[in-house]
Amino acid sequence: MKALKIIGALLIVTCFNLACEKVIDIELEDSKTRIVVEGGVFQYTNTLLNTGYQAINLRSSHPYFGSLDSDYSISGAEVTVRENQTGDLYVFTESETQSGLYETNDLLAKLNHSYTLIVTAMVGDELQHFEATDSISHAAPPMDEIGFHKDSMKDGLNSNNIDHGYLTLISFSEPQATKDYYKFTTYLNDSIIRNDIDGGTQWILLKRDEHLDADVDSVIINDYLIPLEEAGQPIRVEMTLISKETYFYLFTLFENSANAGSDFPAAEVKGNIINLTDPNLYGLGYFHCGSRSDITSTVPE
């Protein structure tokens, strides 16, 4: 009798295991393809950079399980930017060397002006029309000085697990008369510094002036150490004065991406790309404008 009970138990366990190994195929529909816009129109306080060159990148969204190695750039689009105060139109032409990159050398952006991006493109298998508008207010304040603070992990100021390096600091006067929003980008050897620890996120810092006063002595550009290979390397800090709407879009995007624990945001962040063909299928990304100042230095010994 005891032997029968054991056999019965084995049969039950075997049946249970077989049931757990059953594979169920579920077909999931891919979401509709959307346009992704990256770029904008910028005025430079450094006259050497104020050449009239502007660029817009267009690509399409890809399926969740799609290959990251595939080319999702959108080619053959019609891209125009309208200066709203004058009605002047600037046509962007696609780069001969990079698919999906649209450029012009004729748009000298102006302060206190707004600009509207106008795009007609094949997205998926449908011709769609898009618009997006942003503005440039006043000029970004010049950065007076760039400095470096040597740091290590034991100091507790950095968060990217690099043993040693430098924190970048700048000084500039922040006007109190206006409510301003800033985006800082740091370049090492003319390439945007990236945090390889979290999968290649660009090191971009956002600031708003409610946390700053006039005649700011110093601002820590980011809490990440710059991974240095040798002294004398050129470092450039770019500060963009952006609109309030751009600031909160980027802030939400970065915050969601960080909370998700991956490169994908925890929730979809809606930008300013309006789909005139199908308003429910709005574009991803953001068309933003602003004034930029920059400063360059070299890595100290």
Predicted features along the sequence, with ranges:
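A sequence/structural signal for flexible, mid-protein segments enriched
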Residues: E21-E301
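Sec-dependent N-terminal signal peptides
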Residues: I6-C15
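Positively charged n-region of N-terminal signal peptides that target proteins for export
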Residues: M1-K5
